Each structure stands twice: as C-alpha cells, then as structure tokens.
Amino acid sequence: MPEESSPRRTPQSIPYQDLPHLVNADGQYLFCRYWKPTGTPKALIFVSHGAGEHSGRYEELARMLMGLDLLVFAHDHVGHGQSEGERMVVSDFHVFVRDVLQHVDSMQKDYPGLPVFLLGHSMGGAIAILTAAERPGHFAGMVLISPLVLANPESATTFKVLAAKVLNLVLPNLSLGPIDSSVLSRNKTEVDIYNSDPLICRAGLKVCFGIQLLNAVSRVERALPKLTVPFLLLQGSADRLCDSKGAYLLMELAKSQDKTLKIYEGAYHVLHKELPEVTNSVFHEINMWVSQRTATAGTASPP
C-alpha cells in the first residue's frame, strides 16, 4: 500500500509508516505491538488494555506469554496511546470490539489454524467479553484481570448516572476528572511509573466516554448468559474502579463450563502491577491456566 505524501502521524508526531499499525473501518490508524516467540507459535493471544492506558503497559505479561510459545499481539484502542482519535473518546463502545475482531482476523490469515485467546484488563476486560460473545465458539479461552462488569457503586449512583445522561446531551466533553492513580495499586513504585508515563491520558474522563462505559456495562450484562468461552478471572477484593461484585456476577451468569475465579484479598485494581506477592501469583495463575489450555486447544478456533 503506497504511503501518503504527507504521512499520518501518531499523537506523538511519529509517522505511522515507521511503526506497526492497522487502519480500522473508520480510517483511523491504530498503533500495534507484536511479541513473537523464536519458534513456531502454539497459539495467538490478543491483549486488550484498559481506559486511559496503552498496550505498552503489558510488556512483562506479553513476554511471559511469549515464553510459552504464544504469539502475543495488541493495539492501542482508538483515542489511546499512540493511536489516532480524540483522547478517550469513542463514538460507540462497539468500535473497540470491531477493531479487535479486525486485528484477530488479520492475524488468523497469517497464522491459520492456531487457537486464539483473549486477555483483557478493566475496560479491556469488557471489550474481551463482548468480543468473545460476538463470536461464540471462536476463541479458545479468555483471561480477565479486574474486568469492567459492574460500575463502581460510588461513582455510578442513580443520581450520578442520570446527571451524566443529561450532561451528555449538553456538555459531552465536560471532564469528570482524572483517574485517581492511588487506587490502581498498593505498589507505590508502579503508581509512580503510571504517573510518569507520557502515553497515559491525563485529560480526565469525559462525560461522553463515561456514558460509553455505562453502555458497555449494560451490554456485558446482556452478553453474560450467552458466554461459553473458557475463562480465568482474577479480581482484587479492594478494587475501587471495577466493583468486585462483578466478578461473582460473571461467574454466576456465564454459561462457560470451564471457568475459574481467584480473589486477591486486599488487592487493588491493577493486579499485574500490584505488590510482588500478588503480581507473582497473577503471573503464575495465568501461566498455568494458559499452558494447560494451549496443550489441549489444538485447532479449536476456526479461521
């Protein structure tokens, strides 16, 4: 494909022609990352990041999975990281799901016959759930870390939700304030890394994006009774961003025959960047779960 005379650039002014990327159905350029094992991959796994962050924050997890001979791939969602789009704005939450399916389809053309897994954190967990629900039987398994299933009861009271819907009609770009980084993790070093990361969106959650997150919660709740994909669900009991009750709801409603929940008492939201004893356990649980299912997945995922 010939490049434009004036090349498209990332929000950080890097030409996309110099970076791995895809162009979505709306013509937006999305920055991609790939972690490829040295040998022949056993499976593919797409990593779906959370709101306001980017795919680069999954480097350690991706390298661990790559060590299991998985080909790990990801992109920065629209409006995030090094992808195009107004920061933390999306016309409809389904755009995120559509883009994931586009990326998955592209990778399956290059690696036909390999099983495909999903891994999602927070908002990325909701994206993973909706992606799996849209294609029953397509995915070999799913790992969910503190997924968005229920809105935080403190921030989604009936009054606040009603107020947000009214504001969305008149002031959709009004900021509701930035994410409080202190509730992400008890690991102060990780919080400092988050605070100094130039690719993190610090503009604050806009009303219009908050509405899309509420829409996502509604769609996830409707999708759960139809969900049959095997999954591993990891959740912190002290998560103040994604209500831990959502984990129990997911376990109760999902029709999956193979489903596992592990609760980390006292842990916050970003379990893969928590206190060492939590994060080490998270990596171990994911390693064991994925290893067992790649050994038995075969060619479960159609092209």
UniProtKB/Swiss-Prot annotation:
Detected in adipose tissue, lung, liver, kidney, brain and heart. Keywords: Cytoplasm, Fatty acid biosynthesis, Fatty acid metabolism, Hydrolase, Lipid biosynthesis, Lipid degradation, Lipid metabolism, Membrane, Nitration, Phosphoprotein, Serine esterase. The modification 3'-nitrotyrosine is found at Y58. Changing Y194F: Does not affect ability to hydrolyze 1- or 2-monoacylglycerol. The active site is at S122 (nucleophile), D239 (charge relay system), H269 (charge relay system). It is found in: Cytoplasm, Cytosol; Membrane. The keyword Membrane applies. It comes from the Eukaryota. Pathway: Glycerolipid metabolism; triacylglycerol degradation. It is an enzyme of class 3 (hydrolase). Changing C201A: Does not affect ability to hydrolyze 1- or 2-monoacylglycerol. Changing C208A: Does not affect ability to hydrolyze 1- or 2-monoacylglycerol. Pfam families: Hydrolase_4. It is a peripheral membrane protein. Converts monoacylglycerides to free fatty acids and glycerol. Hydrolyzes the endocannabinoid 2-arachidonoylglycerol, and thereby contributes to the regulation of endocannabinoid signaling, nociperception and perception of pain. Regulates the levels of fatty acids that serve as signaling molecules and promote cancer cell migration, invasion and tumor growth. Short-term inhibition causes analgesia, while long-term inhibition causes tolerance to endocannabinoids acting on brain cannabinoid receptor CNR1, and a reduction in brain cannabinoid receptor CNR1 activity. This is Monoglyceride lipase. It comes from Homo sapiens (Human).
